[in-house]
Amino acid sequence: MAGAEDAPGRQPELDEDETAEGRRWGAQHAGARELAALYSPGKRFQEWCSVILCFSLIAHNLVHLLLLARWEHTPLVILGVVAGALVADFLSGLVHWGADTWGSVDLPIVGKAFIRPFREHHIDPTAITRHDFIETNGDNCLVTLLPLLNMAYKFRTQSPETLEQLYPWECFVFCLTIFGTFTNQIHKWSHTYLGLPYWVTVLQDWHVILPRKHHRIHHVAPHETYFCITTGWLNYPLEVIGFWRRLEDLIQGLTGEKPRADDMKWAQKIK
């Protein structure tokens, strides 16, 4: 699925003696090339395993939820769907903010596996549109395995009476995991301007999922706002109360670490 995004916004100032070559953003940026090269066969294998397990569990749990469905559950199920979308949106923002703002690619294990894609994305925002389904969704599938496994265990071990009582809660958890699983796919669609399925553009236009115009706000350096990337519903209210800025001030005051220092380092790489 190919696409092109508008320029990622104003970028960090570079020294005057840097060449035009060093000022390029996108796939030819020195930092983007280095980060892309860190994607390893081992990482690919982990993503494949995560996707297969995740979607197997989704299918298993969905069948059980459908078999247990009753009309009288409808109001609580609707509430669970909305609540699941809201919680998923907040969690997507929390993870996105944490990975964008703190840590380093040099950290053991999580650096190359988890933080690396966030650094690459700010330098080359359209790289995500060149990622296939496995690379796009592998990490999110890994994260949602635990709640999906727990749900499958309950369906296998709990009595019908207990499952009847738990049904609204399990619908909430299932919706939360579905939105969580597809968050990066939704994020990819927000960067894709050509060839999107019609139903995806409808969901974006209705703001059921993250719209393309909405997400552009985040891609203005230094990438310090609008972190929620599932539905984007919480971005404006969190910005109004200065939620992320207050968290950053608190952490910087306690640790002395400067927000987005590693992100800026990669953005300024020229060779």
From Swiss-Prot:
GO CC entries: endoplasmic reticulum membrane
GO molecular function terms noted in the UniProt entry: plasmanylethanolamine desaturase activity
Short sequence motif named Histidine box-2, residue ranges: 214-218
Keyword rRNA processing attached: no
Outcome recorded upon mutating residue 191 to A: Loss of plasmanylethanolamine desaturase activity. Does not affect endoplasmic reticulum membrane localization
Result, substituting residue 131 to A: Strongly reduces plasmanylethanolamine desaturase activity. Does not affect endoplasmic reticulum membrane localization
Catalytic activity reported: a 1-(1,2-saturated alkyl)-2-acyl-sn-glycero-3-phosphoethanolamine + 2 Fe(II)-[cytochrome b5] + O2 + 2 H(+) = a 1-O-(1Z-alkenyl)-2-acyl-sn-glycero-3-phosphoethanolamine + 2 Fe(III)-[cytochrome b5] + 2 H2O; a 1-O-hexadecyl-2-acyl-sn-glycero-3-phosphoethanolamine + 2 Fe(II)-[cytochrome b5] + O2 + 2 H(+) = a 1-O-(1Z-hexadecenyl)-2-acyl-sn-glycero-3-phosphoethanolamine + 2 Fe(III)-[cytochrome b5] + 2 H2O; a 1-O-octadecyl-2-acyl-sn-glycero-3-phosphoethanolamine + 2 Fe(II)-[cytochrome b5] + O2 + 2 H(+) = a 1-O-(1Z-octadecenyl)-2-acyl-sn-glycero-3-phosphoethanolamine + 2 Fe(III)-[cytochrome b5] + 2 H2O; a 1-O-(9Z-octadecenyl)-2-acyl-sn-glycero-3-phosphoethanolamine + 2 Fe(II)-[cytochrome b5] + O2 + 2 H(+) = a 1-O-(1Z,9Z-octadecadienyl)-2-acyl-sn-glycero-3-phosphoethanolamine + 2 Fe(III)-[cytochrome b5] + 2 H2O
Pathway, per record: Lipid metabolism; fatty acid metabolism
Topology class, membrane: Multi-pass membrane protein
Span(s) of short sequence motif Histidine box-1: 187-191
UniProt-annotated stretches for the region Disordered: 1-25
Compartment(s): Endoplasmic reticulum membrane
Effect of deleting the gene: Body weight is reduced in homozygous deficient male and female. Deficient mice lack plasmanylethanolamine desaturase activity and have dramatically lowered plasmalogen levels in their tissues.
Site feature location: Essential for catalytic activity: 96, 121-122, 187, 191, 215, 218-219
Keywords: Endoplasmic reticulum, Fatty acid metabolism, Lipid metabolism, Membrane, Oxidoreductase, Transmembrane, Transmembrane helix
Family under the similarity heading: Belongs to the fatty acid desaturase CarF family.
Protein name per Swiss-Prot or TrEMBL: Plasmanylethanolamine desaturase 1
Source organism: Mus musculus (Mouse)
Gene giving rise to this polypeptide: Peds1
